[in-house]
Amino acid sequence: MTIMRKTHPLVKIINHSFIDLPTPSNISSWWNFGSLLGLCLVVQILTGLFLAMHYTSDTSTAFSSVAHICRDVNYGWLIRYMHANGASMFFICLFLHVGRGIYYGSYNMIETWNMGIILLFAVMATAFMGYVLPWGQMSFWGATVITNLLSAIPYIGSTLVEWIWGGFSVDKATLTRFFAFHFILPFIITALVMVHLLFLHETGSNNPTGLNSDADKIPFHPYYTIKDFLGVLMLLMTFMVLVLFLPDILGDPDNYTPANPLNTPPHIKPEWYFLFAYAILRSIPNKLGGVLALILSILVLALMPLLHTSKQRTLAFRPITQTMYWILVADLLILTWIGGQPVEYPFIIIGQTASIAYFTIIVILMPMAGMIENNILNLD
């Protein structure tokens, strides 16, 4: 009798995706982040579901309902902090996952890569709307500032902003619709993840050498299930240390003050994982230019397959491009730092320099380095 997992119409799909999947024998721990992102998504959906049972999306009670969850609901404080810090862990894994993709040339799997970019936008939109829900000062002013950016769109901008707000300012209608979108988007993300995996399994995984590994495949289970489990343990350990010992370390103290439209906080800034994009937005004095730069800061990733000039797929054996890559990583850390600083000298000029460097490295320097390496190795 054939094993059920190989014949059952539903189980065999899972079997081909997670059990008998032919996987390169040499993929490193950098390939763990896909499963960790899956775990983060599950944690966020579950904690979010339990929070939604007690949260009220009304401007007069939203802030109090979050306080009620933390004080009166059984383990409500744990669920709330797991959800808030779960978003941070999600973005750490996302950035490392994208960074791995750039380093090892995984962007050459174009469909998978573009699906990943769409996922990144969807997760960023979800996180932004989630940040508005507690209805603290930074929630309110963050929502006001970011939604206002749409008014930079020529002709329809102002109408569009009022349409999104559901009125003439961020108010009850805005909060209600943001809650609705924040609830539905993770399920849309789950569907997009399935498409992402579908595209990935069409080509098979990349590997650290960038060479074709068809001649040397091993089954995903037990080899990579056990390897992923180690990653899961490490992630959960870091996550629970953060949740139980430093729950507010990544949050903004201003969000413990209820939203007040009459009182603007001294420094309006988003959560840490958006600071790099916020710094790029602020470094351009023109509103529309800033919005375009903000969108392009993520959309530039879609150009990476077109900008790949090297005859080798990964950066593993390309020291010049490796140097460019690590300068880019440092540049993103600088942008993250600048995004959290006030708009004054010397932060403005540092932010502008780092923003120019960000686009220059990706669009000009890395492709040039690839061509130079081809030349040195006589690969032309």
Curated annotation (Swiss-Prot):
Heme b b562 binds at H83, H182. A ubiquinone binds at H201. Keywords: Electron transport, Heme, Iron, Membrane, Metal-binding, Mitochondrion, Mitochondrion inner membrane, Respiratory chain, Transmembrane, Transmembrane helix, Transport, Ubiquinone. It is found in: Mitochondrion inner membrane. The chain crosses the membrane at residues 33-53, 77-98, 113-133, 178-198, 226-246, 288-308, 320-340, 347-367. One of its GO terms (molecular function) is metal ion binding. It comes from the Eukaryota. Its cofactor is heme b. The keyword Membrane applies. Pfam families: Cytochrom_B_C, Cytochrome_B. It is a multi-pass membrane protein. Heme b b566 binds at H97, H196. GO terms for cellular component: mitochondrial inner membrane; respiratory chain complex III. The keyword Lipid biosynthesis does not apply. Its main location: mitochondrion. InterPro entries: Cyt_b/b6_C, Cyt_b/b6_C_sf, Cyt_b/b6_N, Cytb/b6-like_sf, Cytochrome_b, Cytochrome_b_C_euk/bac, Cytochrome_b_N_euk/bac, Di-haem_cyt_TM. Binds 2 heme b groups non-covalently. One of its GO terms (biological process) is mitochondrial electron transport, ubiquinol to cytochrome c. The cytochrome bc1 complex contains 11 subunits: 3 respiratory subunits (MT-CYB, CYC1 and UQCRFS1), 2 core proteins (UQCRC1 and UQCRC2) and 6 low-molecular weight proteins (UQCRH/QCR6, UQCRB/QCR7, UQCRQ/QCR8, UQCR10/QCR9, UQCR11/QCR10 and a cleavage product of UQCRFS1). This cytochrome bc1 complex then forms a dimer. Component of the ubiquinol-cytochrome c reductase complex (complex III or cytochrome b-c1 complex) that is part of the mitochondrial respiratory chain. The b-c1 complex mediates electron transfer from ubiquinol to cytochrome c. Contributes to the generation of a proton gradient across the mitochondrial membrane that is then used for ATP synthesis. Heme 1 (or BL or b562) is low-potential and absorbs at about 562 nm, and heme 2 (or BH or b566) is high-potential and absorbs at about 566 nm. Belongs to the cytochrome b family. This is Cytochrome b. The gene is MT-CYB.
